[in-house]
Amino acid sequence: PDTLLTPPDDEAIRRDIRLVQEMGFNGVRKHQKLEAPRFYYWADRMGLLVWGELPSAYLFNDRAIRAGSEVAFDFLERDYNHPSIITWVPANESWGISNVRSDRSQQEYCRMLTSQLHALDPTRLVSANDGWEQVEQTDLCAIHDYSLAPESCDAYEDWDAVTKTQMRPRLVFADGNSWRG
């Protein structure tokens, strides 16, 4: 908590994990960031579960497609053997694929990354576009709803409505995609 960025040493990593656990959490989602291998080492040793998330490109273009695929491959090659990592997240809230709802090429890119992660590591779950506008290859239907009103939970009682209509702030699945679960 002292640096907000790269921990200065292993003790800082252990302290961060200990603080997370003391707050009652057993896992973290590392948002848009590949952690240093030492973080995963200590998460393994201390029993902290981790969602490994790829960083997103700012724009969707050929360079982003190539870089995303390479980063996914390198991340898995480097860190697949860490038992603390339980889920891979190739995209978050349509960052870098801002038109994934209706753009077929962005949907195919998200599918490609998800399939690549599944092929390289069939032992872990993949949350294709965590939060909204997911493609059907996702293993998790993650919904990010930032509303604070308690009654907003009522909207989630009807599963068909959740997966087929607009939730806050976006659709749960991209056009032409649906829950396979």
Regions found by a protein language model. Give the residues of each.
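N-terminal carbohydrate-binding accessory modules
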Residues: 1-22, 41, 125-127
